[in-house]
Amino acid sequence: MRPSQRAADELRPVTFERNVARYAEGSCLIKFGSTHVLCTASLEDKPPAWLRGQGRGWVSAEYAMLPRATHTRTKRESTTGKPSGRTQEIQRLIGRSLRAVTNLQGLGERQITIDCDVLQADGGTRTAAITGAWVALHDCLKWMRQRSIIKDLPLRDHVAAISCGVSNGESVLDLDYAEDSAAETDANFVITGSGSLVEVQATAEGAVFTETQLTAMLALARGGITTLVEMQKAAVA
């Protein structure tokens, strides 16, 4: 039995709360059980310098954790002078995931930055950030369309993410911290609403894993993503 008493294919309770940041063009507070991530989308009326004059825009992301998002306080990375390798990896992952479903030509020469701030961490912060960031991006684009900045919503599809793992020899969905810290294998899947893969990360932690186990985790992830995409649709309806 899992520490949370959930079935192998069961998500934690997930909620989306939109428009939680007064000044951001789009915002969403997403909760995966006890993991809470605030995602805000900010519009800049110019693209990155290296993109200027090319007639298209850009979507990027930044990721951070509040010092007391975890059991013990973590120093703010701003005090060390640069983000950690983990932080850089995660924010690049979030940006890639969102660009995979965005028509950058449809943005025009503009940039949207998604800030994902972890308020409370209990495993799966990067996957929660991606799933909530899509809602914040959607609402930013909707804000732009309402003001005739863009004509059409330049989103090709939904995108969401979920963690899986092998725990006590069993493939399971949506690991919390207690499960993740003891899992033999840890994996993250980013999948579009139409079922295409954006990114797969899988790492043997305590023991190697088989192709059969990877396939089982992918099947669990697909089921979880289907549920999350339906929740996204309901949230922005």
Curated annotation (Swiss-Prot):
Phosphate binds at R86, G124, T125, R126. Its EC number is 2.7.7.56. Keywords: Nucleotidyltransferase, RNA-binding, rRNA processing, Transferase, tRNA processing, tRNA-binding. It holds the Pfam family RNase_PH. It comes from the Bacteria. HAMAP family: RNase_PH. NCBIfam families: RNasePH. Belongs to the RNase PH family. Phosphorolytic 3'-5' exoribonuclease that plays an important role in tRNA 3'-end maturation. Removes nucleotide residues following the 3'-CCA terminus of tRNAs; can also add nucleotides to the ends of RNA molecules by using nucleoside diphosphates as substrates, but this may not be physiologically important. Probably plays a role in initiation of 16S rRNA degradation (leading to ribosome degradation) during starvation. This is Ribonuclease PH. It comes from Methylocella silvestris (strain DSM 15510 / CIP 108128 / LMG 27833 / NCIMB 13906 / BL2). The gene is rph.
